């Protein structure tokens, strides 16, 4: 079965195939092979982009979408995630896309349930579909990754986006730079080099900003102090390369990690990332569903969980 737990679980060839498929779908390729199949979305963490992006992707594929309120499920009664997935498998759901607040939650599922598991974000761990949409956005801009310099700024320590992107970008031939407060640094991440914010911005083809995850911090820095010291200000943006682009996984804290006027500037690709997310998730769902059919005959459904 083709689970999607981390970016490292995908080969370079598989990554490029997913980008190619997502690009074709964005250009209007019709895909009705999943029409009528059931997909269930279950979210245990607040989500706007991931949740609704998956729902739009599913509906574009012609699927029947079941959106479940996490507060009304038996998880609130103490049911394990494993038993929840097995229950859904038993009633005809054939794949799961899961977000859970626990790091590497998928280890209790992969190889133990009979349907593919797609990770939509695990704690401070990984966020592979976000990484894929970021890669698609970069690929659209530059036609590849080899030789590019991508700087990732902000809360590296708590960011599953940083963790996923740093690994895969390094593997695809890009140079990864990190920048941010010392308390946000992740010394366990071997895929980037820490440099001072101004130097990182000057060197970068892609300036990727991260949200401060206030919910994971006990001490908070003032918004204006953070922007002036570590964020992308108007003055810093003037030192970007002419063709450099600005990216952010969102939600964006305007005036904190990025000056408000830059969010929708000429160099920003923030909303294009969101657009690309729909097509990437269509490609991911199609891949999981089709590859699952290699192991299980008959019609199948897809289940999306976010915890």
Curated annotation (Swiss-Prot):
Pathway: Pyrimidine metabolism; UMP biosynthesis via de novo pathway; (S)-dihydroorotate from bicarbonate: step 2/3. Gene3D superfamilies: Aspartate/ornithine carbamoyltransferase. Carbamoyl phosphate binds at residues 49-50, 99, 127, 130, 250-251. One of its GO terms (cellular component) is cytosol. L-aspartate binds at residues 77, 160, 211. InterPro entries: Asp/Orn_carbamoyltranf_P-bd (IPR006132), Asp/Orn_carbamoylTrfase (IPR006130), Asp/Orn_carbamoylTrfase_sf (IPR036901), Asp_carbamoyltransf (IPR002082), Asp_carbamoyltransf_Asp/Orn-bd (IPR006131). GO terms for biological process: 'de novo' pyrimidine nucleobase biosynthetic process; 'de novo' UMP biosynthetic process; amino acid metabolic process. Disulfide bonds: none annotated. Keywords: Pyrimidine biosynthesis, Transferase. It is an enzyme of class 2 (transferase). Catalyzes the condensation of carbamoyl phosphate and aspartate to form carbamoyl aspartate and inorganic phosphate, the committed step in the de novo pyrimidine nucleotide biosynthesis pathway. Heterododecamer (2C3:3R2) of six catalytic PyrB chains organized as two trimers (C3), and six regulatory PyrI chains organized as three dimers (R2). Belongs to the aspartate/ornithine carbamoyltransferase superfamily. ATCase family. This is Aspartate carbamoyltransferase catalytic subunit. The lineage of its organism: Bacteria, Bacillati, Bacillota, Bacilli, Bacillales. The gene is pyrB.
């Amino acid at each position: 079965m083709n689970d999607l737990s981390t970016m490292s679980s995908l080969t370079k060839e598989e990554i490029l195939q997913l980008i190619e498929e997502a690009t074709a779908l964005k250009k209007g390729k019709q895909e009705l092979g999943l029409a009528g199949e059931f997909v269930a979305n279950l979210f245990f963490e607040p989500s706007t982009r991931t949740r609704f992006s998956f729902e739009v992707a599913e509906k574009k594929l012609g699927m029947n979408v079941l959106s479940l309120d996490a507060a009304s499920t038996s998880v609130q009664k103490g049911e394990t995630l494993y038993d929840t997935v097995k229950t859904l498998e038993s009633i005809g759901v054939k794949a799961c896309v899961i977000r859970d607040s626990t790091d590497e939650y998928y280890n209790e599922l992969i190889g133990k349930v009979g349907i593919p598991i797609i990770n939509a974000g695990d704690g401070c761990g990984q966020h592979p579909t976000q990484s894929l949409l970021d890669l698609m956005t970069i690929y659209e801009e530059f036609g590849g990754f080899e030789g590019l310099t991508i700087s990732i700024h902000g809360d590296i320590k708590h960011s599953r986006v940083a963790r996923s992107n740093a690994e895969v970008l390094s593997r695809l031939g890009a140079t990864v730079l990190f920048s941010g407060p010392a308390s946000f640094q992740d010394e366990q991440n071997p895929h980037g080099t820490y440099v001072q914010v101004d130097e990182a911005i000057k060197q970068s083809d892609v300036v990727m900003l991260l949200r401060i995850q206030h919910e994971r911090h006990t001490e908070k820095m003032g918004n204006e102090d953070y922007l002036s010291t570590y964020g992308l200000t108007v003055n810093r943006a003037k030192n970007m390369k002419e063709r450099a682009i600005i990216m952010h996984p969102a939600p964006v804290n305007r005036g904190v990690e990025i000056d408000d006027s830059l969010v929708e500037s000429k160099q920003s690709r923030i909303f294009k990332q969101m657009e690309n997310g729909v097509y990437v998730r269509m490609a991911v769902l199609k891949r999981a569903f089709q590859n699952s059919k290699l192991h299980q005959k008959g019609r199948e459904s897809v289940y999306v969980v976010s915890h």
